[in-house]
Amino acid sequence: MTIILGLDPSLSCTGWGVIRAEGSRIAHVANGQVKTDAKAPIADRLHHLHAAIAAVIAAHDPDRAAAEEIFINKNPQSTLKLAQARGCVLAACAAGGLAVNEHAARLVKKSVVGTGGADKAQVQAMLKVLMPGAQVAGADAADALAVAIADANLRSIANLRSP
């Protein structure tokens, strides 16, 4: 059994989701969102984000983490803020002793829904099928759960291929 922490980093609202994976079976453990105050200084927002993710790691003791690869936005300021938030989240994982697997957004969607072009509604609908009864905190938490599920699926496939 493996506990996986999925992460969808953002400065305004970072989603997180924890699943338990055993072979091809997955189970929902917990999920949530870390919101930061847009009016606060960026250093305070990043500190809050780091502390919150560190608390999630301490509470759920995952075996590994997974995050979406960064994408380049048309707005350089938005890309910079995303990179800063992502760095904070990855640093919290490293401080907690977690390896972080990174996956492209299209690969996450393909692994969970079956098509890399799936929209957020399709991902959320599939989460309801894969984890019936799970109360998902919001769109960012749903994305984080999808990242964790994709990581579990990709690891299962890799294990099947190895001799």
UniProtKB/Swiss-Prot annotation:
Reactions catalysed: Endonucleolytic cleavage at a junction such as a reciprocal single-stranded crossover between two homologous DNA duplexes (Holliday junction)
Residues at which Mg(2+) 2 binds: 68
Gene Ontology biological process: DNA recombination; DNA repair
Source organism, top-level taxon: Bacteria
Keyword Transferase: no
Key words, A-Z: Cytoplasm, DNA damage, DNA recombination, DNA repair, DNA-binding, Endonuclease, Hydrolase, Magnesium, Metal-binding, Nuclease
Cofactor binding, per record: Binds 2 Mg(2+) ion per subunit.
SUPFAM superfamilies named among the record's database cross-references: Ribonuclease H-like
Coiled-coil parts of chain: none
InterPro entries listed in its UniProt record: RNaseH-like_sf, RNaseH_sf, X-over_junc_endoDNase_Mg_BS, X-over_junc_endoDNase_RuvC
Subcellular location: Cytoplasm
Annotated Pfam families: RuvC (PF02075)
Active site (record annotation): 8, 68, 140
GO molecular function list: crossover junction DNA endonuclease activity; DNA binding; magnesium ion binding
This protein's GO CC annotations: cytoplasm; Holliday junction resolvase complex
Family: Belongs to the RuvC family.
Function (record text): The RuvA-RuvB-RuvC complex processes Holliday junction (HJ) DNA during genetic recombination and DNA repair. Endonuclease that resolves HJ intermediates. Cleaves cruciform DNA by making single-stranded nicks across the HJ at symmetrical positions within the homologous arms, yielding a 5'-phosphate and a 3'-hydroxyl group; requires a central core of homology in the junction. The consensus cleavage sequence is 5'-(A/T)TT(C/G)-3'. Cleavage occurs on the 3'-side of the TT dinucleotide at the point of strand exchange.
Subunit structure: Homodimer which binds Holliday junction (HJ) DNA. The HJ becomes 2-fold symmetrical on binding to RuvC with unstacked arms; it has a different conformation from HJ DNA in complex with RuvA. In the full resolvosome a probable DNA-RuvA(4)-RuvB(12)-RuvC(2) complex forms which resolves the HJ.
Protein name stated in the entry: Crossover junction endodeoxyribonuclease RuvC
